[in-house]
Amino acid sequence: MYVIENPKVPSVYQIEENLKAGVEIEVNGAVLHGNDRDFAIELLSGTNIVLHVKFEFNGEHSIVLNSLINGEWGPQLRHSHFLKRHDPFHVRIYVHEGYYNITVNSDLLVEFDHRFPVVAVQGIGIKGSVDIESIVFKGYEFKTEWKKRHAIVNEAVCEAYDTVTNAPSVVQIEGTQHY
């Protein structure tokens, strides 16, 4: 298990090893605002947003799930959620062979089919009106040193991440690929 504690928002962190079935990522935090602000958790690969999980607080309190592949958004899925201002939350993304399980506070919210190879995921981005306590990575082999590289990538990317439609990617900053 690897834990990033109290990450700055917005932030992008490189995922040092390939996603695969059995891996899970947990994001623990609290909603900062209610009806006027949103937040998103995204799995990133180059300029692609492989998995976009956006919590919206505009009236109907919905979670939008989607992917941005080669500059094109796919069909979005919407589900209602129960979070409100200052609520603590625990979002868990569990990787299966053909889909992700996404839970909020231990309740299964949705299964979302892979639209892009999970082995291509290079990073996780978090942006919006949210306070993050921790990001927890489980199920990896942890053969590489994760911590040293996170500070480098985060400083290079986090300032621009929340200000552009397509976040700068880890591969653009680092010049490496994870395939």
Swiss-Prot record:
It comes from Caenorhabditis elegans. GO terms for molecular function: carbohydrate binding; galactoside binding. This is Probable galaptin lec-7. Transmembrane segments: none annotated. The lineage of its organism: Eukaryota, Metazoa, Ecdysozoa, Nematoda, Chromadorea. Keywords: Lectin. SMART domains: Gal-bind_lectin, GLECT. The keyword Cell wall biogenesis/degradation does not apply. InterPro entries: ConA-like_dom_sf, Galectin-like, Galectin_CRD. Residues 11-138 form the Galectin domain.
